[in-house]
Amino acid sequence: FLGVPSCDEFGNANGYSGKACCGSLGYAMVDADNAKQVVMLTEELLPYPHNPASIEQDQVDLIVKVDRVGDAAKIGAGATRMTTNPRELLIARSAADVIVNSGYFKEGFSMQTGTGGASLAVTRFLEDKMRSRDIRADFALGGITATMVDLHEKGLIRKLLDVQSFDSHAAQSLARNPNHIEISANQYANWGSKGAAVDRLDVVVLSALEIDTQFNVNVLTGSDGVLRGASGGHCDTAIASALSIIVAPLVRGRIPTLVDNVLTCITPGSSVDILVTDHGIAVNPARPEL
């Protein structure tokens, strides 16, 4: 069952035509490609043929018209919000400084920021640094945000490869910016595919619920083992990128983020290069050149 803002009577659909604009259908594209039965749920039927189509007519079995497919206004809440928290902004500023001084911050570099307030906020601190050094990024990858769209429209990021639109600005940008490119999760990070975009990634900034002294990261469960979030492309981008940066506060409330051993290892420490916290920066000893 795939929810889309609109489609035609054969099921041709994208995620940005219609009132319930949700942006990239990167994950739905893989579902549609592999499922035995594909049912499209939509609130608006358009004349045939609807184009461009992220999900195409030869993949769709049934179309069901519903009164309302979802609340697009809630896209960009929770983990994909843009933070105003001073501690998260402090961490983001430090992470931007790490990127600038890493050796990977040069003309034509590529980047991704994961979910979580501090990691998403890194992009806003890179703008001035890119301008002052006359540096442009070839592409930004992954979940695309309003800040990345802003840098793209200012000419600082040449292309956006979007597997999931993190907010309404990113969702709407897909319709108007020809170099804002929708990709499937298969193209994004599938090691079994013939070409995964993560393999072209220079820098990724990711969040953590826990990280241990061996740099292993838990991004899925709380200290009690209960599911708290989703890992997305965390482990894929960490191992594939040239530089993986984890951003997290040392303590959340009374719960430490830095522990002896993570409860649930999502991304192994061998894939993690640098930890940036509100109290300092730790470089993985396996990367002495950093």
Question: What are the language-model segments listed below?
Answer:
Residues F1-S110, A121-M130, D134-D138, A146-L290:
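Conserved phosphate- and dinucleotide-binding cores of soluble alpha/beta proteins
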Residues G142:
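Active-site histidine-anchored catalytic micro-motif
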Residues G114-L120:
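Core structural elements
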